[in-house]
Amino acid sequence: MSAITARSQVAHISTRFLLISDTHSASPEQKPQGSQNVSQLPLPKADVLLHCGDLTMIGTLLEYEKTLDLLGSIDADLKLVIAGNHDISLDEVYYRRKGQSMQRHTGGYSEDLPAKARELWLGERAKSAGVTYLEEGTHSFTLKNGARLRVE
C-alpha cells in the first residue's frame, strides 16, 4: 500500500492596491496647506482603493461630499474607506462631547451632523460612487479578479 497525499493548490491572483490617507477633503490636484507631497490625477487604476482616514479637516458634510466626489473619480473595483481622527462627526459619541468646541469657529456644529454623515457614507450616493464605508468589525470581499480580501 502506498499513501497518497493531496495538496491543495492556492491560486495566486495579482491584485493592485492603492492606499491613500489624510486627504482632508482636498483633491490630489489641490495642495493642502502645509502639504509637501500631493499626488496628481489621474491616480493609477487599482483592484482595491483603501482610504485610511482623515477624509476631512473637521468632519463637515461639505468636506465629506468633496472626498466622496474624489473617491468616485478614482478607477478602482473596490473602494474602502475608514474614518480618521479628523472625521469627528463619524464618531457620534465623540462629536457630541467635543464637536461643538472643535467646529465653533466654522459655524459647522449641528446636532444632526453625525446622522447626515453616516447617511452619506452608508447611503445611495456612496453606493453609486462604488464606495464602502468600513465600521469596526471584520469585512470580507470577493474582488472582480477572483481574489478574496478580509479586513479586520
Tell what function each PLM region has.
Residues 1-78, 87-89:
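N-terminal active-site segment of His-dependent metallophosphoesterases
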Residues 7-17, 139-151:
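Beta-strand-turn-beta hairpins that frame and shape the catalytic cleft
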Residues 39-53, 124-141, 149-152:
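Extended, compositionally biased low-complexity polar/Lys-Gly-rich tracts
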Residues 69, 73-139:
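Active-site neighborhood of divalent metal-dependent phosphoester bond hydrolases
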Residues 26, 61, 96, 139-140:
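A generic structural micro-environment signature
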Residues 16, 59-61, 110-113, 128-130, ...:
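A short linear-motif detector with a strong N-terminal bias
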